[in-house]
Amino acid sequence: MLSINNPIVSKLGLSGLASVSLRPNAFARTLKIKTELLENNDRRKHNDTKFISHPMFPHPEWTNEEVEMVTPTHRVPKSTMDKAALRAITSVRTLFDIATGYKKPKTPEEIAHRFEGTRWEMNENKWLTRIIFLESVAGVPGMTAAFIRHLHSLRLLKRDKAWIETLLDEAYNERMHLLTFIKIGKPSWLTRFFIYMGQGVFCNMFFFMYLLYPRFCHRFVGYLEEEAVSTYTHLINDLKAGKLPKFDDVEVPEVAQQYWTELNEKSTFLDLVERVRADESKHREVNHTLANVDQKNDRNPYALKIEGTDKPQPEKGLKSKHPEGWEKEDLIL
């Protein structure tokens, strides 16, 4: 029997034992849901600059003052459907928080201490993981709903009254968010795996739900966007407090500069995140509004501004009178 004291084993085996003992740890390190913050040089090296086309849905220019005034709002559920949608998004949010190691601060003490020393403490890599997960899911509802409404229009031989355009614009916008952040961080293979799985499950569930209950789906997305605005507000507060120093030197990717035309090479990561939050706030308003109207007969109130009236109307800007969604009686349909 070979002993550890055997000269042959001591010469040949100890290094092997050491290497074997290290392998599980190295493998365990890869089995994490995480995203690596790329250095600026790495981002430039992997930057895709070939055959860049102009955005299909040009983004409106927003000033710093406009994006800074965006705040979290909540639409109080009024019907059973509203309550069901809110419960659904609360359940999804809870699972998402656990998966990404996130906890929403609720007290001044939690905001100040940021859960330091606990699994809930957020750093640059964890923020990127959460954002990329969020944006990979957020781009599904608009495209799925637009696809279904497109088929309805073809099958029923009638106009869609401009819902499709707004839904496609929303999906395109969310995808631009994702394309921007993957230029800043590199997700691990396990993170990508859960993105694949999450998209497959969510897309199919949303597809069938939209066929049956489109109003519920728009309310669900409205509450989802409420959570997105809340998350980005938390990130913005951490950035302004200097809690995430690695983000200070991040260069805004070219794809973001081309989409948000007011951004340039001197823009900061904070400038970028404020515009992403503003986008989410607009999706929040739009989807809550669409959930309030007749899904089959009413027009999309964001597609056309009615002339010759002093009555306030929805618009694409951020200065909305109803950030939590317009009621049907306030609209010209």
Q: For each predicted feature, which ranges?
A:
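Non-heme di-metal
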Residues: 2-8, 13-16, 21-22, 26-333
